[in-house]
A protein has these predicted regions:
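Conserved catalytic core of the tyrosine transesterase superfamily
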Residues: 1-150
């Protein structure tokens, strides 16, 4: 089986069995085609049924120089799914991406309001009725306790 046949079967699986949207299928396919292109440019002829983990690691090392860790994680995840499909359909015995870890992605701290912004927010509350008093209490609690609305 060559790469394009395997990719077509995988696309059919994603569409029919998993019910994914065309856009999702296109994104998964793009990541697999990125690997195929790299293999071709590197003169590596291995079929998807024979490719070894070391080759996948070389590819990931190559893309790590070009793209953000979040994109690397997405590509690794997509390749894991592709090779899991090949294992599930018994085209391969093992998944060469199984023990390859995605890069660690730090979590971004949430945006916070400045003291001035909080003062403006509290000043904008209409305190002439009980609902205004309630709203002020809610804002004071959220701000004072460091809570956030999600």
């Amino acid at each position: 089986m060559n790469w394009l046949d395997a990719l077509k079967y995988y696309q059919d699986y994603l569409r029919i069995e998993r019910g994914l949207s065309d856009n999702s299928i296109k994104n998964y396919s793009f990541d697999i085609k990125k690997l195929i292109k790299w293999l071709k440019n590197s003169s590596i002829i291995d079929s998807p049924l024979e490719i070894k983990r070391e080759i996948i690691q070389e590819f990931i090392y190559h893309i790590a120089k070009e793209i953000h860790p979040r994109s690397q994680s997405r590509i690794i995840s997509g390749l894991k799914g592709f090779f899991n499909y090949l294992v599930f359909e018994e085209y391969r015995a093992t998944n060469p991406v199984d023990h390859i870890e995605s890069p660690k992605i730090g979590r971004k701290l949430p945006d916070t309001l400045s003291v001035k912004e909080i003062d403006h927010l509290i000043a904008a509350i209409d305190l002439s009725n009980s609902q205004g008093e309630r709203n002020r209490a809610i804002i004071e609690i959220l701000y004072g306790c460091g809570l956030r609305v999600s």
